């Protein structure tokens, strides 16, 4: 059966005398050889601190060949991910029953997956989440490595998918031998078709020769009934509009810093502290000279001979200045914060905001793209809610990223006080540096007990306690 994606190609007269499988084979070969996939894999290697400095060579065997790796790319990625995803988001929906259902979906496991998707997106430019039901019938989100996905879009803006292919390798055991095979999964509105990639063409997986459903319902008699989503189940979470990963902006600077540091280390290791100038040395060769010097602390020279020494110049200030400049440029290009800045710790609240400007701008775009992805995921949440018989209105859903920013707490609290009467109480509380979502539950309990949640009358002042003790003494 032809997929809707293939029918669309036919209607647009984009194919001629070519089968659907042949098109998939062309796309797979092109994808595997593409620069985009190569860059994604390289980004993963740089995150694991496996950088190009390992390729550094020297022209003479005896020379030192340092290969210093600093983990700079990992630090930049983790800073952005930690800033936007480390703190628990504020997720809300009108209706107590709906909120309980929402909390069961966006639990710690799913929030951890969203954070992992954020790391994948920053590294590789785009991350992909696959909605599915687990063995307990719960809606989950599976992160697929970005380089495994070949998306087929309905539009040039890449807003809606027609289909997609996943290409991945897996170990298999045949006749007592462990082998690695490449598997291909083709997803569209009709379900999933499994293939095996031989390196040149596709073959249907003998274990699954028919299109499978996205999920199954099991009847009382154990019969499995396949179902498919009405939408292609793949959600892109982008780092930015162009799906450019952070390594695109930072690789050359990271390579330069590591090369300069490695070369500088080589120079210091190979440079002798003293250079000997020999005059009329009475010896066979320089090897004998060094041996006599180290062993006997003396050397033989003729009557008009002698030994002078020169102090080697090991000034590295120029190299260190270049490394410092490159480091500054790196954080500029990455739109990140250099935590080694001496002035960072003494900055006031307003100064901290200015220092976070670049990081905020970058994370604003990342947050905007993730809000789009979460909105797409809500469609699957609605289907899940309908199956559970839970009323779910996604138009009343909010997902707020709580950024992990260093702030001046006193200034933040005073800003909250100054906002009374301008903003609603909940908005003010959410901006308080000590706020946690659990506060709402405790405030509600206090109100039910007839206590003023903002009253401090339950606590005596120090001077009141003193007066009580004085009265007790008088009695």
Regions found by a protein language model. Give the residues of each.
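A general structural signal for short secondary-structure junctions and capping/turn motifs
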Residues: 118-123, 155-157, 174-176, 265-268
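Extended, helix-rich architectural segments
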Residues: 1-144, 470-475
């Amino acid at each position: 059966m032809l997929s809707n994606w293939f029918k669309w190609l036919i209607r647009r007269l984009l194919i001629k005398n070519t089968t659907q499988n042949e098109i998939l084979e062309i796309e797979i070969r092109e994808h595997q050889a593409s620069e985009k996939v190569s860059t994604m894999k390289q980004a993963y290697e740089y995150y694991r601190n496996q950088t190009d400095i390992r390729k550094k060579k020297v022209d003479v065997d005896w020379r030192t060949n340092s290969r210093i790796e600093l983990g700079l790319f990992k630090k930049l990625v983790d800073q952005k991910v930690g800033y936007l995803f480390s703190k628990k988001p504020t997720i809300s929906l009108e209706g107590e029953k709906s909120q309980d259902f929402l909390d069961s979906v966006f639990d710690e496991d799913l929030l951890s997956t969203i954070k992992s998707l954020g790391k994948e997106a920053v590294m590789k430019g785009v991350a992909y989440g696959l909605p599915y039901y687990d063995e307990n019938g719960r809606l989950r989100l599976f992160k697929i490595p970005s380089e495994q996905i070949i998306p087929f879009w309905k539009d040039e803006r890449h807003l809606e998918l027609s289909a997609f292919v996943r290409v991945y390798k897996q170990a298999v055991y045949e006749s007592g031998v462990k082998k690695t095979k490449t598997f291909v999964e083709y997803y569209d509105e009709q379900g999933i078709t499994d293939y095996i990639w031989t390196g040149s063409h596709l073959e249907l997986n003998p274990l699954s020769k028919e299109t499978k459903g996205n999920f199954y319902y099991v009847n009382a008699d154990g019969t499995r009934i396949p179902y498919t989503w009405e939408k292609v189940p793949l959600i892109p979470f982008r780092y930015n509009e162009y799906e450019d990963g952070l390594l695109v902006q930072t690789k050359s600077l990271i390579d330069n810093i590591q090369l300069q540091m490695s070369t500088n280390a080589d120079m210091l290791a190979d440079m002798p502290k003293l250079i000997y100038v020999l005059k009329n040395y009475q010896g066979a060769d320089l090897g004998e000279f060094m041996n006599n010097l180290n062993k006997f602390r003396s050397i033989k020279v003729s009557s008009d001979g002698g030994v002078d020494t020169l102090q080697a110049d090991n000034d590295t200030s120029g190299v260190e200045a270049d490394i410092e400049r490159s480091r500054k440029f790196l954080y500029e290009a990455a739109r990140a914060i250099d935590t080694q800045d001496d002035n960072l710790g003494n900055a006031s609240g307003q100064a901290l905001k200015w220092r976070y400007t670049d990081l905020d701008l970058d994370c604003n775009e990342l947050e905007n793209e993730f809000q789009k992805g979460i909105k797409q995921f809500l469609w699957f949440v609605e289907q899940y809610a309908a199956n559970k018989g839970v009323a779910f209105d996604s138009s009343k859903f909010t997902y707020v990223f709580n950024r992990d920013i260093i702030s001046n707490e006193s200034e933040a609290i005073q800003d909250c006080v100054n906002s009374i009467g301008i903003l609603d109480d909940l908005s003010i509380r959410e901006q308080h540096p000590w706020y946690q979502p659990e506060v709402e539950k405790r405030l509600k309990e206090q109100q039910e007990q007839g206590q003023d949640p903002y009253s401090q009358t339950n606590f005596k002042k120090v001077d009141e306690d003193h007066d009580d003790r004085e009265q007790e003494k008088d009695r």
